């Protein structure tokens, strides 16, 4: 395409295949327009004016706005062809722009005749559009193949023509990656998508058909196009009808039953869809299923079976294959089909699907079947789509589609059709692959099915390699592969896969994703959004749904990609079904996101109409023929479920329209609402059913429900409508059943996607997208509706600024956030997410823009495309265009450094573009080769590669999404990303964006984007920053003024790429922020101020990637780090060394994170990821350091560029940090509002000059590397004041600022959560807004670097934390190696801060007042933060006269302790004024080191006195003072708490004995009292020398100890549980005293034992019976009278600890004859042993006497009254002393 549209800047993307090239100009333009949006970043920059003009031209007027919206939607979403697309086209040439604008504008139906003409002119491509199953897909496809130069080389449509096998995937991917993977993948994506949408498995044939006739593809688009091109509703409708009939014929041949059924059902596409979903309509699809899945009993039965039959089957299947499927009425059929697929899928790649698990098969089945169901849905859809699209693909597509669903061969198509790939994140890939498989359909199809089933790398390799082998290598391939790979390999990491799929789908769906995701509900940009919308929440879900399904898939992905996929398909299917059932309406709604689509849909009223509108929007420039085809198809689909569809559609429309309305489609809404009025009645019944099912789904999705609160009705309507469409009756029955089954099976088949769908929330949290689960289930129904509504509302809102959208956005925001990783692809979803969604959309735009970043203008264009992708098309589009204008990458943006950053942005943008349906061909172009290699390298890589490749942007995005679940993938991606980075500037941008989008997705994006995206991000970011500055401001204002999507969308559009990029990231977890920051980084010099928000977003998103890296390992948590990495890499320029690049990127991203947070006011939540990253960085300091060293060794070149500076920084400190900071400071300053709050420890950087920015990033890394040096470095930074010495504390600071954002991410890391949360309170207040804004850069950099090593899991956690705003700390902790984080401590006892007396300090250790410790005043804040977060705090110093002994922090048993060192400082003169006393407790002396811990509160002096005096207190044996004696004492009283251990400090037993003692009293506290040692040595039989007991007993300390002892005994007498409670709480007031007394008693008792040689029975009796009676009587022996003595022991046995009488039957009294001379010794021994019990009894008596005098007294009062009886206490003390003295005398 570039070749064809070189002037537009499409030159960047590889020229489309000849077929594409040869496609009519209009279609090419249409596609190009779309693709450029997604993949023509360069085009954007190159033809920025044109793009901007065309975009703005479109934007100014409502119709234009609508068009733009559509375009935006298309470009952004599955509307790659949306405004951006047209503009991209326009950018290519004004004629193209006009054409495109004209093309998309007609979608609104308000386009000027010329536009319409132009649009109609592309009616040929309309066929093409139809050929591309989804309108968007078609559009994309058209754009790609026919009108998108970007798609040219790999245009799936084109390639479908030329190479059905490979191209289909590419095509589908093209649809997906049309924006993202425009060059290679887009075509494939597009076509594939359309093929997938209509007949996923037939994609290849479809493709081949599409290129030539676009018949099959056209057919699907017909529905879509109908929806898409409502303006030409009548003609298009007629055309569609004709095409439908044609398609019917075409389809029948391939899949007679399925197609016929499809057509029949297709006639009611929604009906069919509903049927599929309901099983009733799925009959035909089922039949198809049968055909395809004859082996699959369920499918066959379903298809052949009647609805009832199908329902049971569905139930079974659902239960078995798609509990997820159940959620939506469409799901049942899906499930059913899934089963078919399952059986079938296993055929092709039984192993893989099976490995995937039951779920995989289920998923596969789900996919296949959901496909099938979707297929049916798609059948219905495909009939809507297929019908439209199937003309070419028709027989094959439909056939295959259904074949996949039903026939074995069809699986591909089924995937395609079902849009498994789209629906199922995995499936999308798989599906795409399947579609791709068109040529090698059976295997590929199976593979894809399998792939999705296996959902994992197996499939990836199988599908990706087989289906996608070339394509995987190929950009399109990669796109698919990645999508697929992502979906699949990330199927491994369900999130990854799902996300990838979704990403891919979302992106591809966005690009191709609309088609794919939609059915791919997202394949149609409109479709996907529509689907999303259509799915209601589902529509949102589509994007969300796609993302959501993706999410579902993604989240379930961990369980099973299949599961996730299934869930997605379920979600998707329901979404798709609903969507399709609502058919194109949902799509149109999606399309509607741009007003034109909804409008056109409303106009058409038909889902297909909506679809057409959507489709039209998607590739408005496609031939009107295609549109007409769509119209025909549309009419066909309308016809099929016309009543149902209409009713459902209306209902759907109503809810959707409202959503759309709020989002961006005002007129559409009106039409939709009008229709809804009529349809609502029809659908009311169904709606009720739908509502019921939706309720179920809502219940399942839970989260989404809230989001649907305002739009719940709408959502329910939407859901109902789609589902009603599915099968009004069957739907009612089956949907309910499905839902029930879905719910039941979701739980049952947690593995399965449905489960994923329902439970996706859980997986999502891993992804940091708790909403993903919602999106699936909830999205399906509630979320789907809500999301859809939200999306629409957000988009409409963005355009219309409706409050409703904001509500929806807010409500959906949670769901959306979860969905966001996928949603990030779907701008509408992002918008649904409110600000975040919008921003995510914008990041998508950004991605798209960046996609073409190789040509600075291209990113703009893509961004623009994405902007349209953002649901708020009218305003957003405008803003986006403005943004684009600004974004038109300035020279500065293209600076090498910036460029690297932009490279990252490009990656992200590319991914976003792909997600948005923008062709990523630009990106793909530059990054295709490397990307392909990378993709081949790994799934994550694959994703990354996709991201890198313009066509793979979607993949990248997908991969990111997918990689979220796969930390490994991320690393691979990172490495690949590095390569790519070098090779592709723009690709990296795409990747970056993708990554940013996926930071939530996590790893893949983290790693890959980190590498390649870096450069791209640099460019795109700068450009975006420049262009987005005003918008950013506007965004900020808007966001602040409105939380709705409109503002978010506007912002996003304003920021376009970055914003969109940000949106995606943000949506996911905070990636948005990262993305923005990323961009900010890029625009440090040129566009810092321009796009501060975006920068911030990028930064935040970057932190997210770091999290993703961590999460990848852990759970697809953070893409932030990797996002950061890409930037870093970008900065480091394209280092060949992937690892080094990764590190660089990580560092860079960390820096970016820090930097970006400054400007992320709107995206405050995303700062948290940054913080998290920072934290993680700290956690992984050592690992990072090691890694850096390794990198240096392995890749000496690494020392060049960013890494070199970073390494230097690590060596010299944070000087460099300031440069990075400086660049970002403006952004931060601008965004300081909210961003400031989120800013973390790095704020000082903000203060630093721009020159410090790069260093600051490196500084961040260095922080992570050298905690101490870093701490000092940070000290220099004002923002790191509290944690100057501790990078951890710095991270903590950052966390403080980003605590809310991090909290969102917290879900994944509970461990860290605690610490982080603890740290958060301190840190949040700590960093100043702006200062923090800057400082985070360094901190983030550190976190990023470390993340590269360890943060993957943490990153994932961070992502999740991003979702839950309170877990920043947790993430932070997670980011640090567990061994580097200690248990958090909320407060620190520092003189002047916590000097309250009479407060127990609690905790282990002995407070010794004589020990004076101090801490530097300047370190106090850092110290507090570090302790709070568990990070390494500054050292403390022990005052030793004129010297200070240094105590350094250590972690022992998870506790932060300080160990003595041999370092000393002088402590005299002025030095004394620089320190504050800090209260510590002595733990123990071990290894010749003294260990202390810092008190949280100032301890009372009493314990310390006791402890001090105990050594000197006389033991009854006079041994107490001796350490051994005290040790013995402790041992003797096991009841005494282990705290006694702390007493051990003064005297340690010999090493061997000490070890034994330690084991024995490991739990006891090591106090420096000899008692403990006494106790210990007692156990060892060590008898210490007897001290003079009298001497001790007479001391005041001894009296205090005894008094405390008595106080405790009185308490125990009142409450036997007191002792246990005190031991649990490590009481430090009373327990030490009791232990001391017990130790003394044990010590003396042992000394007596030495003199008493007791028999064991006698000894046992002495110790068992508390009462002893001496019996002496004279024996009357003949010899004279000799005294005979006996000792009688009796009494009740008691518990030695609680002193309660034992309930066990006590032995009868025992008598022992003893030596009269030793009776006194026995008595003494007995008294010592039972002394506590005896005193306890005395206390009980005293208590009873007190209670008699004073009734109604509480325990405290009684204890106080007893203790006030001084005489009583002193008498007991005297008796105690006498006892000990007596023992001493006897033993001496």
UniProtKB/Swiss-Prot annotation:
The keyword Ubl conjugation applies. There is a cross-link at residues 1112, 1137 (Glycyl lysine isopeptide (Lys-Gly) (interchain with G-Cter in SUMO2)). Residues 1-53, 1510-1537, 1562-1575 have a biased composition (Low complexity). One of its GO terms (cellular component) is chromosome. Disulfide bonds: none annotated. Residues 60-69, 478-492, 532-569, 576-594 have a biased composition (Polar residues). It holds the Pfam family DUF4211. It comes from the Eukaryota. The modification Phosphoserine is found at residues 670, 940, 1041, 1262, 1281-1282, 1401. Residues 1126-1136, 1545-1561 have a biased composition (Basic and acidic residues). Residues 1-69, 472-498, 532-617, 1104-1163, 1234-1264, 1494-1588 are annotated as: Disordered. Keywords: Chromosome, Isopeptide bond, Phosphoprotein, Ubl conjugation. InterPro entries: DNA_MethProtect_Complex, DUF4211. The modification Phosphothreonine is found at residues 1003, 1394. It is found in: Chromosome. Plays an essential role in the protection and maintenance of transcriptional and developmental programs. Protects many bivalent promoters and poised enhancers from hypermethylation, showing a marked preference for these regulatory elements over other types of promoters or enhancers. Mechanistically, cooperates with TET1 and binds to DNA in a common complex to inhibit the binding of DNMT3A/3B and therefore de novo methylation. Interacts with TET1. This is Glutamine and serine-rich protein 1. It comes from Mus musculus (Mouse).
């Amino acid at each position: 395409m570039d070749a064809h549209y070189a002037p537009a800047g499409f030159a960047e993307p590889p020229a489309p295949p000849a077929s594409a090239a040869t496609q009519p100009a209009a279609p090419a333009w249409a596609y190009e327009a779309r693709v450029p949006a997604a993949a023509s970043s360069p085009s954007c920059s190159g033809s920025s004016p044109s793009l901007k003009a065309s975009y703005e031209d479109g934007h100014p007027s409502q119709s234009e706005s609508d068009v733009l919206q559509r375009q935006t939607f298309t470009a952004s979403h599955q509307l790659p062809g949306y405004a951006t697309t047209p503009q991209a086209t326009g950018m290519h040439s004004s004629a193209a722009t006009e054409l495109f604008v004209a093309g998309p504008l007609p979608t609104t139906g308000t386009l000027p005749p010329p536009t319409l003409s132009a649009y109609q002119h592309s009616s040929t491509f309309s066929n093409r559009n139809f050929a591309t199953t989804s309108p968007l897909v078609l559009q994309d496809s058209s754009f790609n193949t026919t009108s998108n130069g970007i798609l040219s080389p790999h245009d799936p449509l084109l390639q479908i023509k030329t190479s059905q096998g490979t191209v289909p995937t590419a095509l589908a991917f093209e649809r997906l990656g049309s924006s993202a993977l425009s060059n290679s993948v887009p075509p494939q994506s597009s076509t594939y998508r359309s093929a997938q949408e209509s007949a996923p498995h037939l994609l290849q044939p479809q493709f081949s058909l599409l290129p030539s006739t676009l018949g099959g593809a056209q057919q699907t688009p017909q529905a879509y196009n109908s929806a898409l091109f409502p303006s030409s509703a009548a003609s298009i409708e007629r055309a569609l009808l004709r095409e439908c009939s044609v398609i019917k014929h075409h389809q029948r041949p391939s899949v007679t039953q399925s197609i016929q059924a499809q057509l029949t059902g297709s006639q009611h596409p929604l009906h069919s869809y509903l049927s599929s979903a309901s099983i009733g309509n799925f009959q035909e699809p089922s039949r198809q299923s049968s055909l395809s899945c004859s082996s699959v009993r369920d499918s066959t039965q379903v298809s052949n079976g009647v609805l009832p039959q199908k329902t049971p089957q569905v139930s079974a299947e659902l239960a078995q294959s798609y509990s997820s499927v159940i959620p939506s009425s469409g799901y049942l059929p899906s499930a059913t089909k899934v089963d078919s697929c399952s059986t079938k899928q296993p055929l092709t790649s039984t192993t893989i699907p099976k490995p995937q698990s039951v779920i995989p098969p289920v998923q596969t089945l789900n996919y296949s079947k959901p496909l099938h169901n979707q297929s049916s849905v798609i059948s219905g859809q495909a009939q809507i789509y297929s019908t439209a699209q199937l003309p070419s693909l028709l027989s094959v597509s439909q056939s295959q589609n259904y074949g996949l669903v039903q026939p074995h061969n069809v699986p591909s198509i089924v995937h395609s059709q079902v849009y498994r790939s789209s629906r199922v994140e995995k499936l999308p890939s798989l599906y795409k692959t399947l579609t791709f498989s068109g040529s090698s359909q059976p295997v590929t199809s199976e593979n894809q099915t399998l792939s999705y089933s296996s959902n994992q790398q197996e499939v990836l390799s199988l599908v990706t390699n087989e289906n996608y082998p070339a394509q995987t290598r190929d950009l399109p391939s990669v796109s698919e592969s990645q999508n697929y790979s992502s979906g699949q390999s990330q199927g491994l990491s369900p999130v990854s896969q799902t996300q990838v799929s979704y990403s891919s789908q979302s992106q591809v769906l966005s690009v191709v994703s609309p088609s794919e995701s939609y059915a791919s509900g997202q394949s149609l940009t409109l479709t996907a959004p529509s689907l999303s919308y259509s799915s209601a929440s589902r529509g949102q879900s589509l994007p969300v749904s796609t993302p959501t399904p993706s999410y579902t898939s993604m989240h379930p992905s961990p369980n099973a990609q299949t599961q996730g996929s299934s869930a997605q398909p379920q979600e998707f299917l329901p979404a798709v079904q609903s969507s399709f059932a609502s058919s194109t309406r949902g799509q149109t709604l999606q399309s509607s996101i741009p007003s034109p689509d909804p409008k056109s849909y409303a106009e058409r009223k038909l889902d297909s109409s909506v679809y057409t509108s959507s489709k039209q929007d998607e590739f408005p420039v496609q031939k009107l023929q295609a549109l007409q085809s769509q119209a025909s198809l549309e009419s066909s689909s309308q016809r099929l479920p016309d009543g149902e569809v209409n009713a459902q559609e209306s209902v759907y429309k109503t809810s959707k329209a409202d959503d759309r309305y709020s989002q961006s489609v005002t007129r559409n809404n009106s039409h939709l609402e009008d229709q809804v009025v009529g349809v609502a009645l029809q659908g009311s019944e169904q709606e009720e059913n739908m509502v019921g099912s939706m309720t179920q789904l809502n219940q399942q999705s839970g989260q989404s429900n809230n989001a649907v609160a305002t739009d719940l009705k709408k959502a329910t309507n939407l859901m109902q409508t789609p589902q009603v469409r599915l099968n009004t009756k069957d739907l009612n029955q089956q949907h309910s059943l499905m839902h029930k089954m879905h719910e039941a099976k979701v739980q049952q088949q947690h593995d399965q996607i449905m489960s994923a769908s329902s439970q996706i929330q859980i997986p999502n949290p891993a992804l940091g997208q708790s909403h993903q689960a919602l999106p699936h289930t909830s999205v399906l129904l509630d979320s789907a509706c809500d999301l859809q509504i939200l999306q629409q509302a957000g988009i409409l809102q963005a355009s219309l600024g409706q409050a409703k959208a904001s509500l929806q956005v807010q409500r959906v925001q949670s769901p959306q956030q979860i969905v966001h990783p996928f949603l990030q692809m779907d701008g509408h979803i992002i918008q649904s997410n409110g600000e975040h969604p919008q921003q995510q959309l914008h990041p998508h735009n950004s991605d798209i823009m960046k996609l073409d970043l190789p040509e600075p203008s291209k990113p703009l264009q893509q961004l623009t495309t994405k902007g349209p992708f953002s649901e708020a098309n009218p305003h957003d589009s405008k803003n986006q265009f403005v943004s684009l204008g600004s974004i038109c990458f300035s020279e500065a943006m293209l600076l090498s450094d910036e460029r690297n950053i932009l490279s990252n942005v490009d990656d992200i943008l590319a991914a976003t573009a792909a997600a948005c349906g923008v062709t990523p061909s630009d990106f793909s172009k530059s990054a295709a080769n490397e990307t392909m290699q990378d993709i081949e390298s790994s799934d994550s890589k694959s994703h990354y590669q996709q991201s890198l490749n313009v066509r793979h942007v979607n993949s990248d995005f997908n991969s990111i999404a997918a990689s979220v679940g796969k930390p490994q993938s991320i690393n691979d991606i990172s490495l690949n990303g590095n390569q790519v980075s070098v090779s592709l500037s723009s690709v990296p941008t795409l990747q970056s964006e993708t990554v940013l989008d996926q930071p939530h997705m996590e790893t893949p994006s983290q790693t890959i984007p980190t590498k390649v995206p870096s450069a791209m991000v640099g460019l795109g970011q700068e450009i975006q920053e420049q262009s987005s500055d005003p918008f950013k401001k506007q965004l900020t204002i808007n966001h602040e003024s409105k939380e709705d999507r409109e503002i978010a969308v506007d912002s996003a559009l304003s920021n376009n790429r970055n914003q969109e990029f940000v949106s995606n990231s943000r949506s996911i977890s905070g990636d948005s922020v990262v993305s923005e920051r990323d961009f900010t980084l890029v625009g440090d010099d040129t566009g810092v101020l321009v796009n501060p928000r975006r920068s911030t977003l990028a930064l935040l998103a970057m932190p997210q990637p770091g999290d993703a890296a961590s999460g990848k390992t852990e759970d697809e948590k953070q893409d932030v780090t990797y996002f950061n990495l890409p930037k870093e890499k970008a900065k480091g320029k394209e280092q060949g060394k992937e690892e080094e690049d990764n590190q660089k990127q990580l560092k860079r991203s960390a820096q970016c994170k820090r930097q970006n947070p400054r400007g992320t006011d709107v995206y405050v939540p995303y700062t948290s990821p940054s913080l998290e990253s920072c934290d993680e960085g700290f956690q992984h300091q050592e690992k990072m350091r090691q890694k850096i060293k390794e990198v240096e060794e392995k890749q000496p070149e690494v020392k060049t560029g960013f890494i070199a500076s970073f390494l230097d920084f690590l060596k010299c400190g944070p000087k460099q940090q300031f440069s990075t900071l400086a660049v970002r400071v403006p952004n931060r300053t601008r965004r300081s509002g909210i961003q400031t709050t989120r800013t973390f420890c790095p704020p000082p950087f903000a203060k630093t000059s721009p020159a410090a920015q790069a260093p600051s990033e490196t500084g961040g890394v260095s922080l992570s590397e050298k905690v101490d040096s870093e701490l000092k470095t940070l000290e220099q930074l004002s923002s790191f004041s509290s944690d100057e010495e501790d990078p951890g504390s710095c991270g903590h600071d950052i966390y403080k600022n980003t605590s809310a954002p991090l909290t969102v991410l917290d879900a994944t890391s509970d461990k860290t959560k605690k610490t982080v949360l603890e740290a958060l309170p301190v840190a949040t207040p700590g960093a100043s807004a702006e200062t923090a804004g800057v400082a985070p850069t360094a901190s983030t950099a550190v976190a990023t670097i470390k993340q590269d090593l360890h943060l993957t899991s943490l990153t994932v956690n961070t992502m999740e934390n991003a979702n839950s705003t309170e877990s920043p700390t947790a993430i932070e902790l997670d980011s640090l190696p567990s061994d580097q984080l200690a248990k958090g401590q909320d407060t620190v006892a520092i003189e002047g801060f916590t000097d309250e007396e009479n407060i127990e300090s609690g905790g282990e250790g002995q407070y010794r007042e004589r020990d004076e410790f101090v801490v530097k005043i300047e370190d106090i804040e850092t110290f507090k933060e570090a302790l709070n977060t568990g990070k390494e705090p500054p050292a403390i110093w022990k005052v030793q006269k004129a010297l200070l002994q240094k105590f350094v922090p250590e972690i022992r048993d998870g506790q932060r302790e300080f160990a003595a060192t041999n370092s000393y400082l002088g402590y005299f003169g002025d030095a004394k004024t620089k320190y504050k006393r800090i209260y510590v407790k002595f733990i123990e002396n071990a290894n010749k080191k003294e260990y202390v811990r810092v008190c949280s509160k100032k301890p009372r002096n009493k314990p310390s006195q006791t402890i001090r005096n105990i050594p000197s207190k006389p033991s009854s044996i006079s041994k107490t003072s001796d350490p051994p004696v005290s040790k013995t004492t402790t041992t003797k009283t096991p009841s005494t708490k282990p705290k006694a251990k702390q007493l051990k400090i003064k005297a340690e037993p010999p090493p061997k004995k000490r070890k034994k003692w330690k084991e024995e009293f490991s739990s006891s506290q090591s106090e420096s009292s000899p008692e403990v040692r006494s106790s210990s040595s007692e156990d060892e039989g060590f008898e210490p020398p007897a001290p003079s007991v009298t001497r001790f007993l007479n001391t005041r300390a001894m009296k205090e100890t005894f008094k405390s002892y008595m106080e405790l005994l009185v308490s125990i007498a009142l409450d036997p549980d007191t002792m246990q409670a005190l031991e649990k709480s490590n009481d430090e007031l009373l327990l030490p005293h009791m232990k001391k007394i017990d130790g003394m008693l044990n010590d003396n008792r042992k000394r007596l034992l030495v003199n008493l040689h007791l028999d064991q029975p006698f000894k046992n009796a002495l110790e068992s019976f508390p009462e002893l009676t001496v019996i002496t009587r004279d024996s009357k022996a003949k010899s004279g009278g000799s005294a005979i003595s006996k000792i009688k022991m009796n009494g009740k046995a008691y518990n030695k600890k609680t002193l309660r009488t034992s309930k066990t039957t006590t032995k009868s009294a025992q008598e022992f004859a003893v030596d009269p001379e030793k009776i006194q010794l026995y008595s003494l021994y007995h008294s010592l042993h039972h002394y506590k019990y005896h005193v306890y009894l005395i206390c009980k008596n005293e208590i009873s006497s007190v209670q008699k005098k004073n009734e109604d007294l509480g325990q405290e009062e009684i204890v106080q009254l007893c203790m006030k009886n001084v005489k009583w206490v002193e008498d007991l003390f005297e008796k105690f002393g006498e006892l000990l003295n007596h023992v001493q005398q006897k033993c001496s």
